[in-house]
Amino acid sequence: MSSRSPDLPGAFLGAPIAHRGLHDRACGVIENSRGAIRAAIEAGYGIEIDIQPAACGEAMVFHDDTLDRLTAETGAVRERSAEALGRIALTASGGETIPTLGEILALVDGRAPLLIEIKDQDGALGPDVGPLGDRIAELLVEYAGPVAVMSFNPAALASLVEAAPRIPRGLITCDFTAEHWPRVPAERRAALAALRDLEPLGAAFISHQWRDLSSPAVLAAKAAGRAVLCWTVRSPREERIARALADNVTFEGYLAEVPEDAPGQSAPSPAPDPRPGGLGWRRRPHRQPAGPRGH
């Protein structure tokens, strides 16, 4: 059993967390891009990003394991070098390319809480996760801002226990149904849904699917003092429901309200529309781009 990781800093429990940054494809601001990160910071939100590995082992800020949905290229992210990925433009972005985690850390620089998801590399939430966690730990050792790391796969976080013990670590969780997780064996799905990896991993928090927050396992985790975040609400109504049990929400598809007393946040300014003469994010509906609706 691992020692419990540090608790989440208070900043993660205040301002809502922008899922993959504050993105809006209609305005050329693509998920997990530098523009989406800047917009989230300027609006006073926390930030969630996703990490996939390059062929060279570098940590790239990108959600999918293939390039097809978000670029004009095809094929696996892990088959390209960081240098090559850094030259690939994100579609409809006006020329933005895929950033590294190091670039995003330098951009955020402690100005917003940063929640990092390590994407599963095993394919079935098993132990074959490769060295991605080691690279992330290496990058975070000297980072001074509020940051936490999480994954659906507990094995993806194992290297951080020793390599980055001061970084809060948590699990992304849900009910793990066979419909949504067909490659994961039934016994493993049951263990994940029951949150049996929390204690062995020493996880300080969970981020749980918002519709399943009343799960007995979630309520037990909360009673044990673990912070409960949730994913991914897409309307004020869903946020209100989720906040009955969750300590904070991860959101997209609308503009969540930032509490005036949100800990660890500077006073938010209106996040600008990046288009010349744009109306500004807060003056119009935030449009949800097409793409996967999972975490």
Regions found by a protein language model. Name each.
Residues 1-295:
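Phosphate-group recognition and catalysis centered on beta-loop-alpha active-site segments
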